[in-house]
Regions:
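Conserved alpha-helical segments that form or flank metal/cofactor-binding pockets of metalloenzymes
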Residues: 1-10, 71-103
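Extreme N-terminal leader/anchor segments
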Residues: 1-18, 23-24, 62
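Helix-loop segments that flank and shape redox-cofactor active sites
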Residues: 25-30, 47-70, 136-152
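Internal, conserved structured core segments that host functional sites
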Residues: 111-164
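Long, contiguous alpha-helical bundle segments
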Residues: 42-45, 130
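Metal- and O2-centered redox machinery and metal/ROS homeostasis
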Residues: 12-20, 28, 52-58, 69, ...
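Alpha-helical scaffold segments that form or flank carboxylate-/histidine-based iron centers
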Residues: 30-41, 59-78, 125, 150-164
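Acidic/His metal-coordination segments adjacent to aromatic residues that form catalytic metal sites
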Residues: 19-39, 101-129, 146
């Protein structure tokens, strides 16, 4: 099978609504782009928990502390789930989980820039949760039908849990 035929077969699978798995043949650009996108998503989930975790000890009530701790735990878990499936996809590129994380420290991997903003007040924490999680629900729900099967499956869980954060 020529490269053009493999690409045509790959695109036909996507057009039929089939899901692509990590072990399936895929064009190099599809793999590289997906790794970069999922890496950014994973790191955004993890980095998004950092400003909010600072508020756990200062939350105004025990109920708010518990709620915020659960949210931080969810966000860290989302990041770990997405990073795990990114690891499988990146393996044929010779990248390990350690390499993916190292990319964050070298600036090769990014995360949403909203997480660079400080949250000096409890109100900031609430607004961040409302706006950022609201946007996450909308943007991630749009990706539920992703052609990459592992990502689509993880997003089902992530989207269900993000809905509780608003």
């Amino acid at each position: 099978m020529t490269d053009e035929e493999r690409l045509a077969a790959f695109m036909a699978r996507i057009e039929r609504g089939e899901k692509i798995e990590a072990s399936d043949w895929m064009p190099a650009q599809y793999r590289v782009t997906l790794v970069k996108f999922m890496q950014m998503h994973a790191f955004s989930e993890i980095m998004g928990a950092l400003p909010e975790k600072e508020w756990v000890p200062r939350a105004p009530t025990l109920a708010r502390k518990l709620s915020l701790m659960a949210k931080v735990q969810d966000e860290m878990g989302h990041g770990q789930l997405i990073l795990r499936i990114t690891e499988d996809l990146a393996a044929p590129l010779g990248k390990t989980r350690e390499d993916l994380v190292a990319d964050l420290f070298t600036g090769q991997a990014k995360f949403h820039n909203v997480f660079h903003m400080p949250a000096p007040t409890w109100a900031d924490c609430g607004v961040i949760g409302w706006l950022v999680d609201g946007a996450a629900v909308v943007s991630q729900a749009a990706l539920l039908d992703s052609s990459y099967g592992p990502y689509a499956r993880v997003l089902q869980r992530v989207c269900a849990e993000e809905g509780f954060h608003i």
